Amino acid sequence: MERGFCMFTDASGQQIAVNARLVWYVKANQPETTSLIFFDRDHAVSVEGTLDKVITKLRDAYN
């Protein structure tokens, strides 16, 4: 996985890679909650929580 991308699983179980700078995934049944696995070089960081928490985690990874 290239730096700056995150991987998430949608409601159908399909895994989707998206640019972490641009896109986040909001769970259909819990719109206030976001679940991402963020890949940065050789490690992955799973982030689950409020949208603010996820955005903060992604921002901190790049700053």
In which residue ranges do the predicted regions lie?
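Acidic, Ser/Thr- and proline-rich intrinsically disordered linker/docking segments
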Residues: 1-17, 21-63
